[in-house]
């Protein structure tokens, strides 16, 4: 059998073993599809499950990636696809039902971990030219696939594509350096960008470091000369450039859509490059423990005992030259600097705040560790004297690492002694089995048993680590998911059967409710294919978020609008005709003929406006001065052509109860009107808002709304009070808040800023000082005024119009000085024509489309064209042509050189 085929078969078997055993974990530990647990936790549960349901609809033609009104008010989801959904593993969605998506998620994790084992095996076999024994290759490949990162980040399924492509990229770097070939490097970089540009960026940054590292190793071994290395540097840059070109079909539109409008760089980013060290290197050793998780200043590279013993032996072995130790030491130090020095950590996180998932690039460090172990094992035991020395060496490494790990745990004052001692025991046991293996190489039976025990121990410890991490990261809601999907699908189908017009649907409850009525699953409109006003992703358009914020739906971290209530005039303007709610909402009318499902009834907004109507004027863009109530009044006044007072302020008496509590007493509420409140805050206080003894909601913190409805009895006084940091049990925790510098400068004096104690993320401020800045806005909504203005605008509904994903058409009569309002966002990419002529549209609220009309009949057409998509296609094609051309030229050069050497 040819050598390449043997390597492929062995890699395939390794991949199958890893994937099948991962699925066996699911069966053993009751994960979907065999139980009610799932790896789809955290953001996977909140966002990604709905994304996969949406992708399934796109695959079957029921929705669109190109442009979809199911995503927020409407946007292109090419950037979302490029980041979350582009993996080829997602093609499995074609063969499952939406009720089985949690099962798909777990199976997809297993497939990607199998691929990681396979590509790692291919790398190790090829890079070491068969010098690394098969048993080491298998164990180290499995260690890479089942490393801590794989299960810690399993919920971020899209990042696992980077895990299995990294070995191919780094093997491509080696090919480029040693043989001057670029095909694998360019192709793997291009594929990585296409599958997930984020991990592709991380892997490419690491590949730069790896190029220097490999070049130094090859120079030290005398395999290449310095002049060759310099020439190969230009070849490497050329190859990486071709790889980027290949990925341009998705990467270029993503750059425009994601970075150009979504607010990809979030709040607090001014601090990303502060010169600051997070921690010391002891934490990296302490983090090499079974079940350990990465956190700020503590990275976990755990991938079993075999890898760490081999890496330690690499540094302490007499066979490792001083130069090679220096090269590997500098590479390791560079990596840890990227973990613990804030500016470098920010670069490797691609300039994203990593608060939620620290060390997203930890898989690169684990690969470095495994590589160093492979270097050692590839050279170990080559002579009888080596076997004697190696046996003692692995014992020293195992025992030494175990006790150093214990020392680091005590230095860092970690209390999880059970996992600490278990990790130590496994490392020592592994070193003893390796010792027996090297000491008894002549006694085949003993050496075979010793290595078999090493194999069993490696599989067992990695399996146990997987079990612990999976348990810590799991979701336990997989059993409830199918029932919710069926009921939600049926409810949306009921609404569409009840009303087949053009409208949006909102909801105040989703699949899971957090504490006190907050929720984060804002992508259900994408999953169940209806038009809404909400979505949650890193690819939201910033202009959309700002508009929604102005009309009362708060912008949360530039990734979602908090839509967990109904602001009647705002919903009416957006064409939200139906609201799915667990409880009655003042002003909405329950539709008794539609069945209550998932604890939600269907309510109709009687004030909902049509999606297209004519108004007098050319654009309505009032200035926003921080008050959503007055801004909504101004919008309606502009559309109606006369002053409209929907909201009127109501006097409220504020009382400071203590350092952490403020209350407001609202008096003289106009009879028959709906009361709303808003308590603008300068910085989060993670509070609990008590609304007139009727309900509570988290407020002034993560996922909390801005505007809120206040139920009251006619003629009574309404009372609202806010408790700051309500769930803190420690007084010190409650008394001081960590405030970002951007927030702090909005209310602290220069003296306070100068005197304040700085934190890793900002400045410490007393909670009472933040509460000093709280103020209350209380407004009454006049339903009669709302009824009057909406009837006036409804009477101007466009004569004939249709709205579809990516295409809007309208025929209406008009005259000069009038405009057509469309409840469609003015995204980049819309080409708008009026009577066949391309025009520039105005806006309403600086976001919704307003088309100026002319006298007579106006035929309006809007068609969405993907910005730079065609250019991206051409660049990808150019990249493939350049790769083919360059590979042919390099092949000819190598053949000529080989023929010349043969002569």
Feature annotation, model-predicted:
Residues 78-82, 105-115, 136-138, 143-167, ...:
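Membrane-interface micro-motifs in multi-pass membrane enzymes
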């Amino acid at each position: 059998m040819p050598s390449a085929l043997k390597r492929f078969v062995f890699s395939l078997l390794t991949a199958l073993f890893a994937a099948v055993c991962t699925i066996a974990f699911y069966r053993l530990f009751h994960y979907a599809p065999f139980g009610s647990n799932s790896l789809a936790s955290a953001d996977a549960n909140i966002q990604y499950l709905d994304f996969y349901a949406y992708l399934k609809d796109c695959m079957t033609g029921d929705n669109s990636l190109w442009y979809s009104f199911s995503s927020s008010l409407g946007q292109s989801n090419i950037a979302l696809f490029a980041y979350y959904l582009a993996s080829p593993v997602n093609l499995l969605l074609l063969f499952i039902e939406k009720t089985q998506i949690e099962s798909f998620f777990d199976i997809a994790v297993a497939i990607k971990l199998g691929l990681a084992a396979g590509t790692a095996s291919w790398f190790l076999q090829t890079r070491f030219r068969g010098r690394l024994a098969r048993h080491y290759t298998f164990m180290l490949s499995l260690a890479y696939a089942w490393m801590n990162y794989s299960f810690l980040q399993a919920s971020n399924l899209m990042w696992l594509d980077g895990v299995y492509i990294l070995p191919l990229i780094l093997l491509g770097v080696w090919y480029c350096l040693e043989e001057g070939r670029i095909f694998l490097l360019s192709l793997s970089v291009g594929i990585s960008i296409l599958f997930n540009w984020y991990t592709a960026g991380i892997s490419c940054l690491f590949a730069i470091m790896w190029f220097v590292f490999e070049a130094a190793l090859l120079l030290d071994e005398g395999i290449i000369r310095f002049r060759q290395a310099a020439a190969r540097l230009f070849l490497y840059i050329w190859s990486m450039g071709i790889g980027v070109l290949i990925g341009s079909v998705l990467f270029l539109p993503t750059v425009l859509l994601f970075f150009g409008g979504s607010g990809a760089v979030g709040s607090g980013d001014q601090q990303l490059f502060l010169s600051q060290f997070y921690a010391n290197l002891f934490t990296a050793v302490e983090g090499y423990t079974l079940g350990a998780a990465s956190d700020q200043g503590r990275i976990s590279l755990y991938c079993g005992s075999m890898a760490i013993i081999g890496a330690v032996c690499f540094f302490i072995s007499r066979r490792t030259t001083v130069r090679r130790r220096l090269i590997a030491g500098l590479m390791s130090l560079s990596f840890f600097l990227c973990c613990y020095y804030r500016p470098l950590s920010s670069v490797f996180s691609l300039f994203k705040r990593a608060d939620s998932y620290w060390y997203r690039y930890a898989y690169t460090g684990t690969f470095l560790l495994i590589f160093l172990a492979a270097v050692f094992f590839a050279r170990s035991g080559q002579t009888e004297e080596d076997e004697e020395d190696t046996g003692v060496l692995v014992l020293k490494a195992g025992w030494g690492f175990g006790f150093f790990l214990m020392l680091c745990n005590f230095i860092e004052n970690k209390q999880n002694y059970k996992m600490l001692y278990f990790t130590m025991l496994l490392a020592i046991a592994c070193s003893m089995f390796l010792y027996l293996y090297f000491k008894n190489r002549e006694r085949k039976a003993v050496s075979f048993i010793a290595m078999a025990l090493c194999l069993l121990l490696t599989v067992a410890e990695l399996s146990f680590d997987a079990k612990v991490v999976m348990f810590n990261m799991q979701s336990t809601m997989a059993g409830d998911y199918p029932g919710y999907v069926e009921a939600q699908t049926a409810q949306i189908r009921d609404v569409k059967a009840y009303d087949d017009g053009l409208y949006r649907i909102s909801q105040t409850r989703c699949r899971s409710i957090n504490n006190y009525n907050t929720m984060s699953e804002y992508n259900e409109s994408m999953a169940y294919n209806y038009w809404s006003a909400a979505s949650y992703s890193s690819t939201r358009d910033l202009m959309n978020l700002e508009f929604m914020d102005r009309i009362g739906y708060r912008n949360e971290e530039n990734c979602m609008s908090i839509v967990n209530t109904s602001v009647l005039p705002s919903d009416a303007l957006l064409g939200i005709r139906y609201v799915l709610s667990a409880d009655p909402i003042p002003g909405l009318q329950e539709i008794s003929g539609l069945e209550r499902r998932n604890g939600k009834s269907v309510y109709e907004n009687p004030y909902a406006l049509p999606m297209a109507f004519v108004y007098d004027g050319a654009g309505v863009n009032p200035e926003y001065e921080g008050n959503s109530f007055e801004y909504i009044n101004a919008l309606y006044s502009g559309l109606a052509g006369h002053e409209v007072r929907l909201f009127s302020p109501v006097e409220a008496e504020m009382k400071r109860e203590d350092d952490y509590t403020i209350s407001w007493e609202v008096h003289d509420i106009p009879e028959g009107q709906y009361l709303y409140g808003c308590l603008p805050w300068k910085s989060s206080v993670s509070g609990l808002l008590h609304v007139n003894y009727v309900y509570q909601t988290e407020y002034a913190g993560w996922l909390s709304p801005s505007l809120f409805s206040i139920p009251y009895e006619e003629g009574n006084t309404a009372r609202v009070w806010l408790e700051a940091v309500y769930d803190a049990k420690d007084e010190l925790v409650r008394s001081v808040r960590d405030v970002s510098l951007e927030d702090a400068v909005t209310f602290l004096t220069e003296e306070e800023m100068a005197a304040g104690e700085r934190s890793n993320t900002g400045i410490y401020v007393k909670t009472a000082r933040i509460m000093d800045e709280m103020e209350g806005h209380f407004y009454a909504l006049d339903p009669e005024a709302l009824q009057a203005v909406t009837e006036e605008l409804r009477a101007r509904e466009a004569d004939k119009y249709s709205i579809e994903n990516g295409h809007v058409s309208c025929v209406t009569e008009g005259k000069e000085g009038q405009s057509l309002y469309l409840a469609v966002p003015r995204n980049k990419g819309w080409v708008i024509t009026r009577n066949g002529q391309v025009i520039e549209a105005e806006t309403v609220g600086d976001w919704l489309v307003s088309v100026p009309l002319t006298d007579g009949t106006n035929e309006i057409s809007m068609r969405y064209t993907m910005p730079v998509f065609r250019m991206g296609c051409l660049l990808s094609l150019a990249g493939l042509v350049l790769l083919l051309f360059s590979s042919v030229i390099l092949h000819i050069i190598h053949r000529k050189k080989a023929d010349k050497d043969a002569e």
